Amino acid sequence: MTGKPVQVVAAGGIYNGRTVAAALMLGASAVWVGTRFILTDEAGAPKAHQEAVRTAGHDDNIRTIIFTGRPLRVRNNKYIENWEENRAAEIKELTAKGVIPVEHDFEILGDEIDDETMDNARPFLMGKAAAVVNEKKSAKAVVDELVTDAVKCIHNGERMTAKL
């Protein structure tokens, strides 16, 4: 609409130099790295959140709307699983009225809410990359590694160019 080139920022699954290089080679102007930075020394994430990311496997996170009414990918647990598998119609009904499902639970349970429900009703946000992010580093080390490895991948790709 401005006549200027559109800038594309790639996001989702960006966690190492190979994924940065792939996004750039596919035409992205930049990348957005999310989950990888949860497991850094400087992250403001609580230790429990960092541990949830560090120990996540490929099937340990789920996309849900129970926390905000908008899709989030979070570490799965029995509380979330119960909503998604047994209370899907209730999610639809509540969100159609603008009611956040988790807040609805808190209102209904009131002072009767138990510690386990409280603990499991806390979302540990993470993307699919959490399954391969398992080492805590400084943010600088992460950025340095992303850039260094991306440059290596791009240079390796240049060597593969056919000479016509």
Question: Which residue stretches match the model-derived regions?
Answer:
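Conserved active-site-proximal phosphate/metal-binding subdomains
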Residues: 1-9, 14-164
